Amino acid sequence: MLEGDLASKMLRAVLQSHKNGVALPRLQGEYRSLTGDWIPFKQLGFPTLEAYLRSVPAVVRIETSRSGEITCYAMACTETARIAQLVARQRSSKRKTGRQVNCQMRVKKTMPFFLEGKPKATLRQPGFASNFSVGKKPNLAPLRDKGNSAVVKPDAEISPCMLHTTLGNEAFKDIPVQRHVTMSTNNRFSPKASLQPPLQMHLSRTSTKEMSDNLNQTVEKPNVTPPASYTYKMDEVQNRIKEILNKHNNGIWISKLPHFYKELYKEDLNQGILQQFEHWPHICTVEKPCSGGQDLLLYPAKRKQLLRSELDTEKVPLSPLPGPKQTPPLKGCPTVMAGDFKEKVADLLVKYTSGLWASALPKAFEEMYKVKFPEDALKNLASLSDVCSIDYISGNPQKAILYAKLPLPTDKIQKDAEQAHGDHDIKAMVEQEYLQLEENIAESANTFMEYITVPPLMIPTEASPSVLVVELSNTNEVVIRYVGKDYSAAQELMEDEMKEYYSKNPKVTPVQAVNVGQLLAVNAEEDAWLRAQVISTEENKIKVCYVDYGFSENVEKSKAYKLNPKFCSLSFQATKCKLAGLEVLSDDPDLVKVVESLTCGKIFAVEILDKADIPLVVLYDTSGEDDININATCLKAICDKSLEVHLQVDAMYTNVKVTNICSDGTLYCQVPCKGLNKLSDLLRKIEDYFHCKHMTSECFVSLPFCGKICLFHCKGKWLRVEITNVHSSRALDVQFLDSGTVTSVKVSELREIPPRFLQEMIAIPPQAIKCCLADLPQSIGMWTPDAVLWLRDSVLNCSDCSIKVTKVDETRGIAHVYLFTPKNFPDPHRSINRQITNADLWKHQKDVFLSAISSGAGSPNSKNGNMRVSGDTGENFRKNLTDVIKKSMMDHTSSFSTEELPPPVHLSKPGEHMDVYVPVACHPGYFVIQPWQEIHKLEVLMEEMILYYSVSEERHIAVEKDQVYAAKVENKWHRVLLKGILTNGLVSVYELDYGKHELVNIRKVQPLADMFRKLPFQAVTAQLAGVKCTQWSEEASMVFRNRVEKKPLVALVQTVIENANPWDRKVVVYLVDTSLPDTDIWIHDFMSEYLIELSKVN
């Protein structure tokens, strides 16, 4: 198949797994997570990814939202429609520990190899029949234990809406338990809704309700994202909930509420409502039992908690107040005339400013007027509409509340009420009535001011959400909008509905009078309808803030309308964040200008460090090949330019100190300058400060993040470092800003820069200048160990070297120099550049450098300091690099003897179950499992390896195949098995704890210390039981991979195949996904169903 056709086919599969489309910046990450490769648009001849997508309209449909976000959708394809349904229903884009954040976001997570989810002691443990047979599918008891338990989903967050632990089995045997799991929409798989009937029947066979075995387990309440659905009638739902609570005056468990709601109204209660009760004090009182359970108790709202903002929309009628003397009406009392009747009803309702139940009207009427209430009056309430307002509850004509239409002056009402009721509680009630009356008067005077309860905006639960930066006045208050289905997409849907409502409803008219703080619907530019809040008012114009966009504007009153409550269920989308690391300079005009120019109007990945009212965040630009830390970029941009070192071409610099030499020949130098002198003085002051001050908790780094600048004590003095990678809560990578050295340290070894020195320290730019030796080929990769060692021995930490600059490459940030030691300056023929080419360090490739020297052309005195290099220089150098390295390896015999291997990892016996994690899945015939109970030990070992090898001296050892070593793979050290030595200086290794095959440079392989040989190797090769297929297509493998990879599961062991080598052990298992609240998904059944569907298509 041609590459273009294959890319189109895989692209269609990726897009079909996202019903709501994929944002353009996320598409590459989603494609790679499924296929392992990037979309090859450049190889196909397109300059950008968007250009390629627009060239395949039969595969991709591109839409641009009002916020400027480009979203890609799959075009319909009849051939793969049925496959797409299966892929879509199992798609999971929420990576738990992958190297990518938010699929496309390559942000360094705080704990990248720490697993999220918690199956240990919480997964449903299966019971087994004693007659287990290896040859057939086991006859299992229900996988979910019966009894009291609070299940923690291993792949999701759990809501606090669980049954209280004091409830026994009998208490909820007949009542369905409602649980709400908050995850991204495309991350959930509901078999009831998406699977075909045969599979639904199978998956529901173990749907026994249960609670957790571990009653004492603490479950953290998550931040729950408000639902995107906001079209339900909030008023009606709130009134129904009040009715339920009024029937249960002694309280009701929140977990039982959905059941009673459905039983009474024949509708399902929107699960997002359960998270908003704490914000509805006018509807209910929420109480958490002191017994420590996760369930909450709901009570009817307390009258004293009624707020003015809620009395408008939630008109709860007070009970009719009895008169001072109650006399039953006489049987022979006269009947009131029709004209007088309406007038008397209007006068009566004034007494009940919070409303009167229609059913209570006859009794109150007869008690007050001593006349008989007309029998047919209640059957025709509409006839009273000209003297009172009628509010029908739940659409039931038998349940209505009557309100006075023309209230009397407020002072008279208050006076009468105080005379009739003297006790304190009644006075409090009258105060509430007075507030209600004020609003009624304001409404009748056309000066209505609306106070509407809007749910607060919840911070997304995903690791690295996308945000659109709107504007900022300082870096502590950056206005942003979250981009995603429950945020920007939900907002656009709401605005479309607002446009339809206000454009086609002739009854809505512009507001006549507004008040500061009032919420409105504003007809903005391009006929868009937006939610807004009044900031100030003028004669014909009002200044409003668009609460979903974060900016303000003056609009005409004729464009402002009363906001309908049904558009208030979605949180205000504009919110604020604080940029981490920039707090001390938050108001600096130069910094604000830089941040504004780099961020406003653009979409970024955001790493949320602290989920406070104003979250502390780091922004990342992920639009290029590398992620750019915006916070760090802005900080570097405002450094004091006068303290920078500006190297001039052909200039000579003396007293230069070489501070670091990398394995590719790159070196870092310090050149004497004003900035270096100021840095030295400042570090001395800090040394004195720490010497005189007792170390407190404020001095330690409590919240490490990438780009943060802090201090590290090294060789008796404090030095500036920048955090470059956070491995875990204990270990991280740092780069010394003023020497270029990179190492791993413990978080506890770092210190905060004292506040009094912080601003000065930030202003000083990094003093390490990146250089390379002129006239040496730059594309040869790693130097030979002997060449690097010779260079280090010659100049490293020598403080009186000299350099001559031949070229400054601004784009790469590197200077090409000639380097001299003190005794050889300024003889050009004795420079380090010439010595390293003449030294016996490249004996296997002398032609690389010796044949490259041209008389005169390479002289430091020449204006053109670049040598002419033969065309095959780099090729020959790379070709012979392996031979040089091998010889070097053999010259340094290893001081490590072959150590004993750790014992094999413990596996359950056939017929038993175990909790596992799947780090790698190729297809059902080959995947890797890790015992969940041991993972925390592996995390500790990984941390210790990072710290140990970051400070250990690099050893040159003779490597052998099929031996165990430590290898550095993507900034982490792993225990590996060497599988082979390639001809390009790389070696193939197998990660013994994670089951991955990697290629690493041979220089990154080190002896495995004895202290890291105790823990058994954690990766165990596995095969899925219960499936007959032996050959798996790429599509089937992709489906399986997305179902199990990076997930905690329950494994039922069928067979264990032992081997002398622990990495050759194999296990055949059934896998069960228990992340759904009431259904266990057997992976082999799911794959069998997929194969059946695939065969129908083919």
UniProtKB/Swiss-Prot annotation:
Entry keyword RNA-binding: yes
Residue(s) carrying Phosphoserine: 319, 859
Designated name of the protein: Tudor domain-containing protein 7
Main location: cytoplasm
GO CC list: P granule; ribonucleoprotein granule
Pfam families to which the protein is assigned, alphabetical: OST-HTH (PF12872), TUDOR (PF00567)
Family: Belongs to the TDRD7 family.
Keyword Amino-acid biosynthesis part of the UniProt annotation: no
Gene Ontology MF annotations: mRNA binding
Domain Tudor: 513-570, 703-760
